[in-house]
Amino acid sequence: MAAKLILFVCAIALVAQSVLGTGCGCCCRGCGCGCGGCGSRCCDRFCLCSNSAAPTGLSICSENRYNGDVCVCGEVPFLGTADVCGDMCSSGCGCIDYGCGDGCVGITQSCGGCGCGCGGCGGCGCGGCGGCGCGGCGGCGCCGGCGGCGCGCGGCGGCGCCGGCGGCGCGCGGCGCC
């Protein structure tokens, strides 16, 4: 008799849970007001509302020795870090284009001179990252608003036209731009 009573109580609990656990259709949501109402069309009042996940990125961790060119092209988060440990001989140049006005905060375009060629980062290419040249990072290229031409000797010299990111320079063991 006690077993039947326990089985009956458990059956009632399951039925009550399924009936009482159903919502009535009027939940307590927010009113829909947020930072979407703040206009960010003018740059003197820059409002930001973000709840995105933490950015992920490129990570290389090794005790080996890497030789050769490394070119990275693409969109990166607005706030980013780079950590390089050890002895490293490096040279590079690039153009970063970012803006405010549509609510999107981030680096929208980052271009360097990568492709096939000779020298540090000089090469022949077109598309997102283009450049034609030899030497450090000098080159001639067009990369959708980020291009340049010039020559570099162990440095980052170049003459470019990149909608506000261009310059002329000659680099010998350094970086020349104006």
From Swiss-Prot:
Region annotation Left arm: where it falls in the sequence: 22-46
Region (Right arm (Gly-rich tandem repeats)) residue spans: 111-178
Lineage of producing organism: Eukaryota, Metazoa, Ecdysozoa, Arthropoda, Hexapoda
Keywords tagged on the record: Repeat, Signal
Protein name as it appears in the record: Chorion class high-cysteine HCB protein 13
Function recorded in the entry: This protein is one of many from the eggshell of the silk moth.
Keyword Disulfide bond: no
Leader sequence residues: 1-21
Family to which the UniProt record says this protein belongs: Belongs to the chorion protein family.
Region of interest (Central domain), residue spans: 47-110
